[in-house]
């Protein structure tokens, strides 16, 4: 699928257009058309019903104020999140919540999950913040029960909500253009056009291009167990270039008794894979090409005050080529193509005042084609059934769900062999409770939850040539959480809003899917269910909003995480030097945290952020050779907005890693030192 074949689809979809405004500073009716009116500024901090579920979010000006280029960069400021970052603008960036594993994360883009049946990974580095309005992180699942069945099926969820058109009174279109540039030869132009076609229909068309050489200087230093310095040199990171193009068209509509929306998305990239710095090899030659397309839509109808339903659908086509031209290792030129079809219906009923119920059914169809020898061309059918209920009585709120997962895989072994089928069927529960202990004070809430869920082996886990294992069982997780949230608002004085929340948790991961040596040699590997992990941790967050002299405001946010994530696979594997039993699992720090501050005066903004990741090991054998030092970065940025009669200009300058800290997130993948970005944005 190339760009030329995608553009007609976008052009066909674009005139079908609509939008329903959400929250923030816009006042609207339930199904009315959006408009923005100028009025005296008032700060409102509404209590979110979702707080029965531990959640974190970044949105609006606070999201813009962070020195972040992609969704992955912004999520570094969430507690309990580990970012696997291989460095540079084009490096792969995935996330892990509460040490349960990247594949247990669900990433939802405008309400529908992004899938990858091949390896289960979603590269959050490819989602620019230019078109993102809010990023929300939930432990377990969203608190609202009116949602598709697939939303109940992950251990943690990230919801990315793109920008919605907002129109000033008497205005029917918005145009926004921006240009970013900076270190690593970065160039990033973007353009967004928003149009109101009628009272009930509006649209958005957004596109951007990213180009960078990915070259940056780094210091490579390694010390032997004896204390002798083995390496200490400075080099330039090579083969980290990227060229990518993204375009998406969205249409939004309001009806008399509901809403609908549709979206088409296309992403095309070519990038180098810089590789690890090992064996005195400083430059690699591997390349990767990606083409991702999906079209999705949702329709919600309120039949009565007590009954509403939602229908969702999606088609996705993903193509990837991996090239390793180095014949001294093994020449590879592999191509993969995935197809996904997804349909969902959800039905919400209010049985009695305070008692609600939701029934959802989803169907998903996945295929994978590959150019590998003896590949089995798997096909997967997934049927999900979810029943959820929510009950509120005075200061008590309960929510429970039961998810049924039925999966059928079908493969063809070679060209002439008979098909082989495999089936999985399981039911998994979740229970959430929230209670306000003080009768006359709604500022304090206690919360707790339990959730059991599993993740299916990916197509690579099951069927990758010579490595896959078709007998794999699902990898299961069980989560327990206990916490509180305190939130208070003031309408006068220095402090306008204070929020403190903390959660303690314990997670168990069983049947963990890992690669182990196959046979008598160590050069062949197979995926097996042999892993077990116990995770105990604490997350804490504090936020304060201050305002004085009308023009000045200050927002401060602190996050802290403690985690003990230990390998509990084999009690006999307790050798003091090579053993992994009881060791902290790879790349999970005991301590981590962040500080972010935003100081505003009229049209000027000054933003500071600090991120700290404590000591950790790059394998579960916690010995000196595997030790990774703590790292931290300071980021600083300044913005100025110049308002003119018909347009607004915003200038920004940011410095990341201000003190030039040399560090690795992943062992032997050096990260950039001090780097700069500048941008200008025009809105009219």
Question: Which positions does each model-derived feature cover?
Answer:
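A beta-strand signature from Gram-negative outer-membrane beta-barrel systems
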Residues: 129-176
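Extracytoplasmic beta-strand/coil segments of soluble accessory domains associated
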Residues: 76-116
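Structural signature of Gram-negative outer-membrane beta-barrels, strongest in the C-terminal barrel
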Residues: 352-362, 366, 370-507
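Conserved C-terminal beta-signal and adjacent last beta-strands/turns
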Residues: 194, 206, 252, 389-390, ...
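Gram-negative outer-membrane beta-barrel transporters
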Residues: 395, 497-508, 526-617
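N-terminal periplasmic "start-of-domain" segments of outer-membrane beta-barrel proteins
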Residues: 36-66
């Amino acid at each position: 699928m190339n760009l030329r074949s995608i553009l007609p689809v976008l052009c066909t979809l674009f005139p079908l257009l609509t939008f329903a405004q959400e929250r923030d500073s816009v006042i609207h009716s339930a199904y009315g058309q959006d408009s923005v009116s100028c009025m005296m500024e008032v700060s409102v901090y509404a209590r979110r019903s979702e707080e029965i579920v531990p959640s974190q979010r970044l949105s609006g000006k606070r999201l813009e104020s962070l020195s972040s280029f992609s969704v992955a960069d912004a999520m570094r400021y969430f507690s309990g999140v580990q970012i696997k970052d291989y460095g540079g603008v084009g490096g792969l960036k995935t996330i892990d919540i509460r040490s349960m594993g990247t594949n247990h994360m669900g990433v939802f883009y405008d309400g529908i999950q992004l899938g990858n049946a091949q390896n289960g990974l979603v590269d959050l580095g490819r989602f620019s913040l230019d078109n993102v309005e809010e990023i929300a992180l939930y432990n377990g699942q969203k608190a609202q029960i009116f949602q598709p069945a697939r939303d109940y099926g992950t251990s943690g969820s990230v919801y990315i909500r793109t920008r919605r058109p907002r129109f000033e009174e008497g205005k029917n279109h918005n145009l926004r253009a921006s240009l970013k540039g900076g270190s690593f030869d970065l160039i990033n132009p973007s353009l967004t056009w928003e149009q109101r076609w009628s009272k009930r229909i509006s649209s958005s068309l957004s596109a951007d291009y990213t180009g960078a050489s990915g070259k940056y200087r780094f210091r490579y230093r390694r010390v032997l167990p004896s204390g002798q310095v083995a390496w200490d040199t400075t080099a330039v990171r090579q083969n980290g270039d990227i060229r990518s193009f993204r375009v998406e068209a969205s249409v939004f509509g309001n009806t008399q008794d509901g809403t609908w929306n549709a979206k088409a998305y296309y992403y095309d990239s070519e990038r180098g894979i810089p590789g690890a710095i090992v064996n005195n090899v400083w430059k690699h030659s591997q390349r990767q090409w990606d083409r991702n397309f999906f079209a999705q839509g949702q329709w919600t109808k309120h039949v009565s005050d007590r009954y509403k339903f939602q229908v969702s659908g999606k088609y996705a086509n993903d193509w990837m080529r991996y090239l390793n031209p180095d014949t001294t290792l093994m020449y590879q030129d592999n191509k993969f193509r995935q197809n996904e079809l997804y349909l969902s219906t959800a039905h919400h009923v209010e049985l009695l005042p305070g008692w609600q119920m939701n029934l959802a059914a989803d169907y998903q169809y996945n295929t994978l084609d590959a150019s590998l020898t003896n590949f089995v061309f798997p096909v997967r059918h997934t049927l999900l059934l979810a029943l959820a209920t929510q009950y509120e009585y005075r200061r008590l709120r309960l929510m429970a769900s039961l998810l049924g997962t039925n999966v059928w895989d079908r493969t063809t072994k070679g060209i002439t062999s008979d098909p082989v089928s495999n089936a999985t069927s399981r039911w998994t529960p979740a229970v959430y409770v929230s209670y306000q202990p003080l009768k006359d004070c709604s500022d304090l809430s206690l919360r707790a939850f339990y959730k059991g869920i599993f993740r299916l082996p990916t197509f690579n886990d099951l069927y990758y040539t010579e490595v896959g294992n078709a007998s794999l069982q699902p990898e299961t997780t069980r989560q327990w959480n206990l916490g509180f949230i305190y939130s208070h608002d003031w309408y006068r004085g220095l402090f306008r809003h204070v929020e403190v929340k903390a959660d303690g948790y314990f997670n168990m991961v069983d049947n963990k899917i890992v690669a182990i040596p196959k046979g008598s040699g160590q050069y062949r590997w197979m995926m097996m269910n042999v892993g077990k992990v116990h995770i105990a941790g604490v997350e804490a967050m504090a936020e304060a909003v201050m305002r004085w002299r009308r023009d000045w405001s200050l927002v401060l946010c602190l996050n802290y995480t403690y985690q003990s994530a230990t390998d509990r696979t084999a009690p006999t594997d307790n050798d003091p030097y090579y053993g992994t039993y009881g060791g902290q699992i790879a790349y999970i720090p005991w301590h981590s945290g962040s500080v972010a501050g935003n100081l505003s005066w009229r049209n000027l903004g000054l933003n500071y952020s600090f991120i700290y990741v404590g000591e950790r090991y790059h394998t579960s054998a916690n010995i000196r050779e595997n030790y990774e030092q703590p790292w931290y970065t300071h980021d600083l940025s300044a913005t100025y907005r110049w308002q003119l009669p018909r347009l607004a200009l915003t200038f920004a300058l940011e410095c990341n890693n201000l003190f030039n800290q040399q560090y690795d997130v992943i062992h032997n993948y050096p990260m950039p030192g001090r780097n700069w970005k500048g941008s200008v944005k025009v809105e009219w």
